[in-house]
A protein has these predicted regions:
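N-terminal amphipathic alpha-helix/helix-capping segment at the start of soluble metabolic enzymes
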Residues: 1-10, 84-91, 112-113, 117-129
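Metal-dependent enolase-superfamily TIM-barrel catalytic cores that perform enediolate-based chemistry
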Residues: 120-212
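Conserved active-site and cofactor/substrate-binding residues in soluble primary-metabolism enzymes
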Residues: 29, 62, 66, 81, ...
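Structured beta-strand/loop patches that form or line metal/cofactor-binding pockets in enzymes
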Residues: 1-55
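Metal- or metallocofactor-binding catalytic centers and their adjacent structured scaffolds
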Residues: 36-37, 41-114
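A general secondary-structure signal for short beta-strands and their flanking turns/coil
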Residues: 29-31, 68, 129
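Conserved, mostly hydrophobic/aromatic
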Residues: 3, 34, 40, 71, ...
Length: 212
């Protein structure tokens, strides 16, 4: 698949609820969007490493620059035959997994488009749709969180992920599970704990969480 053109977009989107986690606060999300154009189709990819290097060493604008200045010139005008072939073209640059992932997902979409196949089937999926979940961060109060959970459930979300950090932990999850016992719920700690905290995690065993 010859890559004829690459178009890059650095985009931002305000969040409905501010996102507070163990590594900081955000009221918007930024991402890199990649549009690949080939002779027989086009593909779109995205990477969203946030707008500051708090979650990872990469951030959205840095990923945009990395693709524009270094990665895109390695593949424009070249025949990229597979995902593995794409990785070989980019192997000379260390790290930058978000920037590379944006190109990788766009290549898979381009390849599926050229073959007239939906992307979900091309990558081995078994269904054209998936259950959508909501992700809620630390809030001003448990009551505010419960209101937010009720709102996202009413909007059609069927799974829930909660941010979890010291001071916003077991009692918060207990309150959510009491109010919404049938809503599949995950928690995400973002590296805020160590092995010394295992006893606290055992306290979650009876809450029926889908995943930690």
């Amino acid at each position: 698949m010859r890559i004829e053109e690459i178009h890059l977009y650095h985009v931002g989107m305000p969040l409905v609820y501010p996102f507070r986690t163990s590594y900081g606060d955000d009221d918007a999300i930024e991402s890199l969007v990649v549009h690949l154009v080939g002779a027989d189709g086009e593909g779109w990819g995205e990477a969203a490493p946030w707008r500051a290097p708090g979650y990872s060493p990469e951030w959205a604008y840095a990923a945009f620059l990395t693709v524009r200045e270094w990665l895109a010139p390695q593949i424009v005008g070249r025949d990229v035959r597979s995902g593995a072939d794409l990785r070989r073209h980019l192997a000379g640059f260390k790290g930058n997994p978000f920037a590379k992932a944006a190109l990788d997902t766009a290549w898979w979409d381009l390849d599926a488009s050229a073959r007239g196949e939906p992307l979900w089937r091309a990558v081995g999926g078994v269904s054209p749709s998936v259950t959508v979940g909501a992700d809620l961060g630390v809030m001003e109060s448990v009551d505010r969180l419960l209101e937010a959970v009720e709102a996202v459930q009413a909007a059609g979300f069927r799974r829930l992920k909660l941010k979890f950090r010291p001071g916003w932990d077991v009692p918060v999850v207990e309150a959510v599970r009491r109010r919404f016992p049938d809503l599949p719920t995950h928690i995400d700690c973002n590296g805020a704990y160590t092995l010394a905290d295992l006893p606290m995690f055992r306290a979650l065993d009876g809450l029926g969480l889908a995943m930690i």
